[in-house]
């Protein structure tokens, strides 16, 4: 069967992450100047590494982190493609030295290497990144070649004591040796007016009456903000390097941001007040009369008394509630629980939709490129394509991976290319010439997770039970048809057929017992399907679906006249003369008798006894996460069934594992959770101490792993609850600001859910919540806490409050 994938590939500039010490004024200046020479250069973050100034540290004790961890937060938030160090060792100091792997040398470079002499040709060029020189040429040819003067003039700024303001706000060219050609090309293309930095020039730029040097870096870019604010006015001291870094980065997650230097405040306060008043208007179609508001953000170096004085100046001309006041913050992505969170802007230039066939375990596709760029440039990588692929419904293909920003040696999926870089944005491929094609290997979920565990020092191989469950998942179209078995009675009859249960032969005086031969009368199945049709709201089952999936096979039942064994013959095995399966004697088919009966026989993994060695519970648990938590199909999930795990610390078996990510609409994706679990059937004491110890040792080796314990029965026994509570409380312990191991508990209530887990809870009644918050079903940690409250009657937040009181 051909497997098809759909998705997109989006063109954008390479995202550089410039690592620099907050006190290194000279390097910050160079970074800002080189950003004026890069396509999308002002979309690149400046990541402070090293000792932070005191005013950058949070006044809230619970938000305080070591400077190194804050720098790592910057990296996780911005997810740079290329890391540029202002001095050697900065990446290593924050744990990103793996990016310096020799096979990845171009993804970690020094600031001096950015403009390299390695490349020979008709002129110098950037070692990495798309140069603005191509933009100048294309822009000139498209707009200026036959026009003596542009309506909106370009500017070029004088070099003076206000150079830091020019670099941060307007753009300036590098002072580096052999880099003066950028300025010359700019002058030739735009004939700019020489200007001095000042309030008047600021007004002309932000009122759209002049274009500064950074303007061409945005050619053909669409920048989509993820925050919904009308305006942000960033007030800072340009003599403080930390303030310049704060302003530079704030632009990348707030919009629009107007920089207001304290030295120009008196001249610009009229513009600010007018803009705040203009923004303060009713939100359309809002019945509550809510108004748009602006925000005034102060850099953290600005003293409190200065900030109060500035607010008084604005307040005198602005109505109450027209703006609110804040302080600049270190950015943290939305997966971080602690403190304010934000989302960086989406940047792209072009996008192509993909519809692909997986052939030989791989896909290929054309990728967009910037039309203004020369076909072959000097740099090794000039732009990026971000690929997002999805299957139609649940799939056994590995399309969801954890980010590899720190160590890019896994996964290696780009055939003949380096990468991809896996981020919350997608799979990032770095390109350097026109009309190139992308080639990606598509692994199975089992292969992907086993390779990832090997990188973590854990050998993983499919277990015997895991192979059975894998076959079941495959038969059910990678969980898309899991609803067929999401019924207690259906599983019970399938298991009874698989067990070959002995039944009494009431017609025999000797009371002999015979094997049923893994069969059941068709009438019994028709009754079951009729019953399910009355009780279900979503999935209409039919016997045709069971036979087409290879679960059941139709045939005829016939007793042997020699040994009375109950035989079953498939439609291709019926003849005038048939052979008994037991005694191997032939006998004539009874053509005139009523004895032959139509029967179904269970086949494949469904014919394995003992509830298919737990495969039903595993399959339905995976289906619950893939479908029933979020029925609209916005889940990213890469899964595997049972594995045998072995490392120096332990040797254990787990029933399933998967990466799970709730996709976000119009947003970067979240970081996927790694989930492992144990799945049991209907036994009264199904969960044993050893099962939970297996999960615990995995979580010790991989902190943050989500643990799942599921059973097909509706309730855990009291003994099981005591064991589970110990595991839950162990998992509550904080490691690096997060729970060590959130524990999710599922029963038949969730696994047999007719529509969604939420609906099933509502129908079941107490202790299940009737109105659980929607966030419970989109965040695995919150979902874990809710299942703990339901099944164990313990509440994580109540426990925290008790600890604080004591």
Q: Which role does the model predict for each range below?
A:
Residues 1-243, 248-806:
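Intrinsically disordered, low-complexity Ser/Thr/Pro/Gly-rich regulatory segments
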